[in-house]
């Protein structure tokens, strides 16, 4: 079976090698795999620890001050400072309500999340995705015909179309892919019952979580902290567009993406896109089981399981390494 071809333009060569190795059953970015939950000294990851986490007996803070201080201590707070402050000024009640929800969330055991309400929040947000995406500069109704002449390429073979697709995007700062029809069918069928999932993006400070939500053949991603603080007003920061127009005749599905470059670069968007196939196109029951748990049994879901699976796969390892090198 043909391997999934995923590439990132803009000089992200290592990402191409990383994915090509992964979907041929190889893991070229890590010399040896470790079992889930095992980390060698050379592969230690730094996770941000909430200051003042040792609360006195009796539970949460007596006012919203502690919750707000905790929010500001989030290593990704600066990225969303303006949006959070705008919400605080325009709708103080909504701002306080979200702080209260965060206070309830931090009472839960580490690694667990009682997130039934959060799943509902993500589902409610779906209707607003299109509007918010356009407001952030994304293309409205991005069709395959807006990229190239469909009638013209129908005369070509699947391999020729793949080459045209790759050449077209080679000089563009974006993420793109040519997905075999059977692989896309597996992803698509699973997305119908499990349309939402969580991806972990390596950052210098640890990991940042992004929520993926299918809406038609588009897959929208938004940072988790963005949803927690802005709810339905949270805009998409990455959209993957899938085009099945040639699936039946040519046996391929074309994919490209748009991203908000103020939050993501190409390599980071690539890492998120890779995780779609890691979790939705896998033959490994335990891996897709995380997607099912997130959608069907959210109270049993463990955030750390996503990071463990990402570590096991090797995805994002080179991105993390590059970030650490830039830091030094």
Swiss-Prot record:
* Membrane topology category: Peripheral membrane protein
Its GO CC terms?
Answer: mitochondrial inner membrane; mitochondrion
Q: What subcellular compartments does it reside in?
A: Mitochondrion inner membrane
Q: Which InterPro entries match?
A: ATP11 (IPR010591)
The biological processes this protein is annotated with in GO are: mitochondrial proton-transporting ATP synthase complex assembly
Q: How does it assemble?
A: Interacts with ATP5F1B; involved in the assembly of the F1 component of the mitochondrial ATP synthase (ATPase).
Q: What is the protein's known function?
A: Has a complex stabilizing activity in the assembly of the mitochondrial F1-F0 complex.
Q: What is this protein called?
A: ATP synthase mitochondrial F1 complex assembly factor 1
Gene that produces this protein = ATPAF1
């Amino acid at each position: 079976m043909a391997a999934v071809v995923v590439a990132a333009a803009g000089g992200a060569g290592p990402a191409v090698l990383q994915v090509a190795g992964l979907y041929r059953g190889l893991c070229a970015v890590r010399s040896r795999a470790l079992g889930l939950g095992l980390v060698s000294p050379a592969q230690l990851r730094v996770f941000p620890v909430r200051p003042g986490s040792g609360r006195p007996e009796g539970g949460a803070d007596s006012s919203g001050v502690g919750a707000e201080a905790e929010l500001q201590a989030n290593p990704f707070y600066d990225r969303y400072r303006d949006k959070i402050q705008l919400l605080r000024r325009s709708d103080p009640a909504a701002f306080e309500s979200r702080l209260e929800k965060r206070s309830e969330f931090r009472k839960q055991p580490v690694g667990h999340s009682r997130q039934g309400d959060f799943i509902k929040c993500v589902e409610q947000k779906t209707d607003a995705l299109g509007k918010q995406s356009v407001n952030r500069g994304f293309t409205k109704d991005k069709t395959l015909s807006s990229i190239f002449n469909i009638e013209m390429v129908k005369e070509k073979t699947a391999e020729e179309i793949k080459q045209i697709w790759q050449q077209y995007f080679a000089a563009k700062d974006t993420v793109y892919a040519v997905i075999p029809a059977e692989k896309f069918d597996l992803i698509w069928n699973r997305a119908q019952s499990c349309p939402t999932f969580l991806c972990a993006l390596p950052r210098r400070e640890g990991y940042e979580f992004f929520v993926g939500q299918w809406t038609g053949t588009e897959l929208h991603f938004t940072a988790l902290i963005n949803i927690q603080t802005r709810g339905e007003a949270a805009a998409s920061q990455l959209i993957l567009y899938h085009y099945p127009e040639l699936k039946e005749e040519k046996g391929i599905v074309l994919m490209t993406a748009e991203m908000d470059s103020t939050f993501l670069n190409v390599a980071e968007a690539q890492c998120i896109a890779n995780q779609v196939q890691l979790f939705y196109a896998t033959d490994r029951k335990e891996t897709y089981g995380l997607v099912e748990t997130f959608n069907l049994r959210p109270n049993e879901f463990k955030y750390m399981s996503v990071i463990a699976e990402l570590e096991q796969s090797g995805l994002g390892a080179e991105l993390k390494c590059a970030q650490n090198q830039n830091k030094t």
